[in-house]
Curated annotation (Swiss-Prot):
Belongs to the universal ribosomal protein uS2 family. Component of the small ribosomal subunit. Mature ribosomes consist of a small (40S) and a large (60S) subunit. The 40S subunit contains about 33 different proteins and 1 molecule of RNA (18S). The 60S subunit contains about 49 different proteins and 3 molecules of RNA (25S, 5.8S and 5S). Interacts with ribosomal protein S21. It is found in: Cytoplasm. This is Small ribosomal subunit protein uS2. InterPro entries: Ribosomal_uS2, Ribosomal_uS2_CS, Ribosomal_uS2_euk, Ribosomal_uS2_euk/arc, Ribosomal_uS2_flav_dom_sf. One of its GO terms (molecular function) is structural constituent of ribosome. Required for the assembly and/or stability of the 40S ribosomal subunit. Required for the processing of the 20S rRNA-precursor to mature 18S rRNA in a late step of the maturation of 40S ribosomal subunits.
Length: 263
């Protein structure tokens, strides 16, 4: 009998990263990201080292767990592919999610209504989320960022090397980070797998849903046509042409009053 090899959590996570193309970088390379690059492909695309990705993921999860109040962690994504991922991450970890446009001054301007003072900031891309990263430097807030091979590391404290442009990669990274946070908090035992699928963190195009619903409506069978006689509830034509009126009997009663001795 051939015994099946049981993968370690690290091997299992790296296998999922390979499937979701977390290791695929870009053709451009930032100087400070060289330490995270494993090799360069023939087409010029840089391949990231997934072993270092896993290590930085573990470190980021420990930093998140060290914060007593989960609401003091703010997760940001201006990139559409990361909007659903940050919302789901906030749902399962208790953090605050800001998906979409960042309002300038949220970390520095105390006058605005959306002003917040988090203890930790997590961004999906330090290039597209440059405004919150810059404000965190003024407010002395540590930053954890998903960094590609061309991502600037200025004001970034913990860089997790990964593909931060693909929707599958972003969904998996936030799923792994949320899973590790739940493991470290003791909410989820390591002996049992997390029942939440990675698909829950995956971004979905609303236009595709509309097209899918239209296709379902077109392929659906039409409603059965009912005959006209099934709705014939009106009285026959002859009844409407009768010369009698409903008050004829009443007129005769008034003409012939009842005798007094009949009362």
């Amino acid at each position: 009998m051939s015994s099946k090899k049981v993968q370690s959590p690290k091997e299992e996570s790296i296998a999922k990263m390979l499937i979701c193309k977390v290791h695929i970088g870009t053709k451009n390379l930032e100087n400070k990201m060289k330490r995270y690059v494993y090799t360069r492909a023939k087409d010029g695309v840089h391949i990231l080292n997934l072993a270092k990705t896993y290590e930085k993921l573990q470190l980021a999860a420990r930093i998140i767990v060290a914060i007593n109040n989960p609401a003091d962690v703010v997760v940001v994504s201006a990139r559409p592919f990361g909007s659903r991922a940050v919302l789901k991450f906030a749902q399962y970890t208790g953090a605050q999610a800001i998906a979409g446009r960042w309002t300038p001054g949220m970390l520095t301007n105390q006058i605005i209504q959306k002003f917040t003072e988090p203890r930790l900031l997590i961004v999906t891309d330090p290039r597209t989320d440059a405004q919150p990263v810059k404000e965190s430097a003024y407010a002395n807030i540590p930053v954890i960022a998903l960094c590609d091979s061309d991502s600037p590391l200025e004001h970034v404290d913990i860089a997790i090397p990964c593909n931060n442009k693909g929707k599958e990669s972003i969904a998996l990274m936030y799923w792994l980070l949320a899973q590790e946070v739940l493991y470290l908090k003791g909410t989820l035992p390591r002996s049992k797998p997390w029942k939440v699928m990675v698909d829950m963190f995956l971004w979905r195009d609303p236009e595709q849903f509309e097209l899918k619903n239209l296709a379902i409506e077109e392929t659906a069978p039409a409603a059965p046509h009912l005959a006209e006689n099934q709705f014939a509830t009106e009285a026959p034509y002859e009844e409407w042409n009768k010369k009698e009126e409903w008050n004829d009997n009443a007129n005769e009663e008034w003409k012939n009053p009842i005798a007094a001795d009949e009362w």
